Amino acid sequence: MRSVYIGGGTPTALPLAMLDEVLAECHYDVDEFTVEAGRPDTITPSVLNLLKKHGVTRISVNPQTFNDKTLELIGRKHKSEQVVKAFKRAKKMFKVNMDLIAMLPEETLDDFKYSVDKAVELSPENITVHTLYLKRGSLLRNEGYRNTENTVAEQMVDYAYRKLTEAGYNPYYMYRQKYTSGNLENVGYAKAGEECIYNIDIMEEDTSI
């Protein structure tokens, strides 16, 4: 086993004592230990120090978007500036992945471009670009939102590819889900030599989950 990955969801939202117990059970001698810390309010000095204590090497700080209007619309309880502050705090201690989502409700191509540009400016080791995935039972789907505008979705994904590759990121893994915008893929980008071991092993089916 080369890597440990805890997430999705936000395991850093657990009470500190409980998170300590979980990490202690997963503290193996591996090349890479990733924990998802999607919500910026969970990325506190106490949590970061605990992750470090248990050998975590990589975390995910997931803005989804850097547009505050969209964050409010999709029910997020934070502002983009909180994500930036949490990222800068985490970056001092860990490698970082950031997730972005194309085709969030009411977002334009320019809105998405802004988020991509902001992520590149922050310069995490990894940036993963998702297209919005609507589960059949999701609130957005039940409220009638449909993510079927293929042209805009393709433009968003194309922009992300151009911007990220120009900035020195290379696409290194890809996967597809049902009900995504434009039936497009989710793509992981990494700086040279910073590819996520877990993602590679899972995509190549070289390891068990």
What do the predicted segments below correspond to?
Residues 1-160:
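Conserved non-cysteine loop/helix-boundary elements of the Radical SAM core domain that shape
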Residues 143-209:
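Auxiliary Fe-S-binding modules of radical SAM enzymes
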